Amino acid sequence: MFEKPLGMRDTFPQIFEKVEAVRQTGRDFLTKRGYEFIKTPAVEYFDTVGKASAIADTHLFKLVDSQGNTLVLRPDMTTPIARVATSKLLKEMIPQRLAYFASVFRAQEAEGGRPAEFDQMGIELIGDQSVFADAEVIVTAMELLKHLKLEAFKVTIGHAGILNCILQDYTESIEQQTTLRTLLVHRNYVGFEEAVDSFNLPKAKADALLQFIEEAMDVKDIRDIEKYVRKNDALVYMQQLAQLLEMADLAAYVTFDFTLSSHMSYYTGMLFEVFALGSGFPLGNGGRYDGLLEVFGSKAGATGFSIRVDRLLETLHGQSEMQQEATVVLFDEEQFEAALIKVNTLRAAGKLATLQLRSSLVDEEAFLAHFTEVVVVGQEEIGSE
C-alpha cells in the first residue's frame, strides 16, 4: 500500500542537502562562465519533444491531457532546450550559452533496478559550429568536476561521424550497421566480433572491422586510424580538438576511443563520456548534436553535456566530509521565552540552531547524537563534540 511507483525514489534530508550543495556550487561555477540557467516544463508534447528525443519510446512516461493530446514527462533536457532556443532565444542572440539543473524521467522495467527520475546538471552551447565550442564544452565539464572536488576521472572522446563512416564502408547493409552500433553502445566487443563473423563479409572488410575495434579503443595519435577512414574533415577536426585540450592543460584526463557510441542517437559529431572511480556507469556524457535543431526548424550548430547528479554523489561518497556544526537548544515548557532568546541569538551569529521541547523527545540520546552542540536552557552547555 505504501510502495512508491516503479523506479521512483525518496530523497532523504542528508542526501537532499548534498544535492543542493552540488546545485549551488554548479550554478555559481557555470554562471561565472557566461551560462544562463533555464527551466523548461516537466511535461511536453509527445509529437514534438517526445519524438525528437533520442530516448526509446518504451522508456517515455506518457499521459493524455483533457484535450486528448499525448504528453510526455521530459526524458532529457537537451531536446526541450533545443525547442526553446529555436522558437525564441536564437532570435535574440547567437550563440546561446544555457545551463540547467533539473529532473528527467525515464520509465523502467521491473528488473532494471534503475531510477525512473533523476537530476541532471549540464550546459548547451547553441549557435556555434566550431571546434572551439566543442573544446569549451569538454573543458567546462572537466573543470566543473574538479571544482566539485572530483579529481579521479577520465573523459573518453569519440566521433559519431567517423564511426558511422567506418561502419558504412565495411558492412553491406543498414541492418548490419545498426546491429554493430547497438553492440558498441553496450560495449559488447565479444558480441561485435561474433556479429562480424556471422555477416559473412568479404575477408578484407571483416578483418578491417575487427582490427579497427582493437586499435580504436585507446588511440594515442588520431592519425593512427587514418587508414580505416575515407578522407574527411572529421579527423582533422579531432586533431584540432586534441590540440586545444592540450593547450587547456587537461590532456592527462582525456583518452580517444573511436568505437564510442551512444544511445542518444542525435549526436552527429564529437561525443564524450565521463568515467570516475566509484561509479560503475558513466558519470556524464555530451557531444555535438547539430541535427536535433533541424527538427525544430533551425540549422544552428549545438553542443553540450550533462552530469548525472546521483552518480556524482555516489562517486563523492566516502571522500572526507566535515560534519556541519549544529546546535540544539533544549527547553522545558516554562523556559520557552528564555529558549527563544537563546536560539535567536545563536541564529543571528550565523549558527545552525534547532529549538526543541525536551518532553517531546522519545529517545533523547539518539536525537542529540545528530548535533555537535547541546544547550539546555537554565543549565550550562552540557555537551559538544
Curated annotation (Swiss-Prot):
One of its GO terms (molecular function) is transferase activity. This function is generally fulfilled by the C-terminal part of HisG, which is missing in some bacteria such as this one. It is found in: Cytoplasm. Keywords: Amino-acid biosynthesis, Cytoplasm, Histidine biosynthesis. InterPro entries: aa-tRNA-synth_II (IPR006195), aa-tRNA-synth_II/BPL/LPL (IPR045864), HisRS-like_core (IPR041715), HisRS/HisZ (IPR004516), HisZ (IPR004517). Pathway: Amino-acid biosynthesis; L-histidine biosynthesis; L-histidine from 5-phospho-alpha-D-ribose 1-diphosphate: step 1/9. Belongs to the class-II aminoacyl-tRNA synthetase family. HisZ subfamily. This is ATP phosphoribosyltransferase regulatory subunit. Heteromultimer composed of HisG and HisZ subunits. Pfam families: tRNA-synt_His. Its main location: cytoplasm. The keyword Amino-acid biosynthesis applies. Required for the first step of histidine biosynthesis. May allow the feedback regulation of ATP phosphoribosyltransferase activity by histidine.
